């Protein structure tokens, strides 16, 4: 008798093919496990095969309580420890490179010719299958030899991180299973080159519109140029001196920039409308409303509309769990200037940091790669800290 996929309604088994999970050996060397994860193509929207493999492998760990929602998975210990730590990572990658000869693709590639040695190439090697491999290795081995972690741990694996926020698997888990995501401290295993990056800046986008009056450009005095009217907007932005704000001991550098400008309809028509698009990266001591107030004050007198916004995240490095983690890693923490999913944990009142193997500058590159030893060192650091 053909086994029934537990995620498929019984009435549908006759018409829906059963998907046998790919076997993942979570106890193999973590760099080899990373290569195995790379070999499972999981571009955003196609995480199902990898999610099946992760779920199947984690169900072999009897100490973990598992919940699956779509292609996102929560796996929790329930040891009654006074502290709970969240280790989170996304399963999806950006699309495969299209440039001929690119090494950052699927399957994984070891230029050394010796799997497990040197540099590992492949899509997601840096962002962030190395980090996911560390999560899985920890989940599978932290009870070995009768040992138990000194903290309760919640492992979170989620889909759709590399696309628009409304599709985020982590956002869906927060909405559907928020009670399972409580914790004292969260670590997002995004690539940081083995350095703790605390919190993240927030980001807001604005449109500033100027209006004029259309006319033939040969008789420009009959109209009013909306693009020219936008000149003071650009001048104020150019003259603005971004702040560097210290939050919980980390210096977050802000930026406020025009990122796009469009206006006009033809080469012989005075433009009657111009829109300047602005991006403000603001320190995590500000709310999105506070950031908007800064922009409105700077551009007083102009029509300013906020089109998108995401709050930043305070690093929370003064929390005992965060402080002990930084001490265990032994590296000076740095601020995160870009926005990451640590902000989602911050919204839940959970201090969070970024910490994972790989150089973030290599993420999404045609030749994306990671050092095998960097993955092993990340695993060692987290294992040491969790066992304390």
Label each PLM-derived region with a short phrase.
Residues 2-97, 273-279, 294-297, 372-376, ...:
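N-terminal helical capping/dimerization or prosegment-like subdomains
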Residues 2-5, 16-18, 25, 191, ...:
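Metal-dependent amide/peptide-bond hydrolase catalytic core
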Residues 88-89, 156-158, 186-190, 209-211, ...:
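Short beta-strand segments
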Residues 66, 73, 153, 302, ...:
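Hydrophobic anchor at the start of a short beta-strand
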Residues 72, 159-163, 263-264:
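Short, internal active-site loops enriched in acidic
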Residues 128, 132-201, 248:
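Acidic/histidine-rich catalytic neighborhood of metal-dependent amide-processing enzymes
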Residues 81-83, 115-117, 149-153, 180-184, ...:
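Short coil/turn connectors at secondary-structure junctions
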Residues 84-154, 169, 366:
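Active-site metal-coordination/substrate-binding segment of hydrolases
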């Amino acid at each position: 008798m053909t086994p029934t996929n537990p995620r498929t309604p019984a009435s549908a088994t006759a018409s829906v093919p059963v998907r046998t999970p790919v076997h993942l050996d979570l106890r193999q060397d973590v760099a080899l496990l990373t290569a195995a994860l790379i070999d499972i193509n999981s571009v955003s929207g196609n995480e199902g095969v990898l999610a099946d493999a992760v779920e199947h492998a984690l169900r072999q760990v009897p100490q973990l309580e598992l919940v699956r929602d779509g292609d996102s998975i929560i796996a929790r210990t329930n040891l009654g420890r006074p502290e709970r730590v969240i280790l989170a990572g996304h399963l999806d990658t950006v699309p495969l490179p299209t440039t001929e000869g690119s090494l950052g693709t699927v399957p994984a590639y070891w230029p050394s010719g010796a799997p497990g040695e040197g540099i590992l190439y492949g899509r997601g090697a840096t962002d962030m299958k190395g980090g996911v491999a560390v999560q899985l290795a920890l989940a599978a081995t932290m009870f070995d030899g009768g040992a138990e972690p000194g903290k309760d741990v919640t492992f979170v694996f989620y889909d759709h991180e590399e696309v628009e926020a409304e599709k985020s698997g982590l956002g869906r888990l927060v909405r559907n299973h928020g009670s399972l995501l409580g914790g004292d401290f969260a670590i997002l295993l995004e690539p940081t080159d083995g350095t703790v990056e605390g919190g993240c800046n927030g980001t807001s986008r604005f449109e500033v519109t100027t209006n004029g009056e259309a006319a033939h450009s040969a008789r420009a005095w009959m109209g009013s140029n909306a693009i020219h009217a936008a000149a003071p907007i650009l001048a104020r932005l150019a003259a603005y001196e971004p702040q560097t704000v210290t939050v919980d001991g980390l210096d977050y550098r802000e930026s406020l920039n025009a990122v796009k400008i469009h206006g006009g309809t033809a080469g012989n028509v005075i433009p009657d409308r111009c829109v300047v698009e602005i991006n403000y990266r603001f320190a995590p001591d500000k709310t999105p409303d506070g950031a908007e107030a800064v922009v409105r004050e700077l551009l007083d007198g102009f029509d300013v509309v906020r089109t998108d916004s995401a709050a930043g995240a305070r690093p929370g490095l003064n929390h005992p769990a965060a402080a002990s983690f930084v001490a265990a890693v032994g590296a000076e923490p740095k601020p995160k200037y870009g926005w990451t999913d640590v902000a989602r944990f911050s919204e839940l009142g959970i201090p969070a940091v970024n910490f994972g193997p790989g150089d973030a500058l290599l993420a999404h590159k045609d030749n994306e790669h990671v050092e095998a030893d960097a993955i092993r060192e990340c695993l060692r650091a987290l294992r040491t800290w969790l066992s304390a």
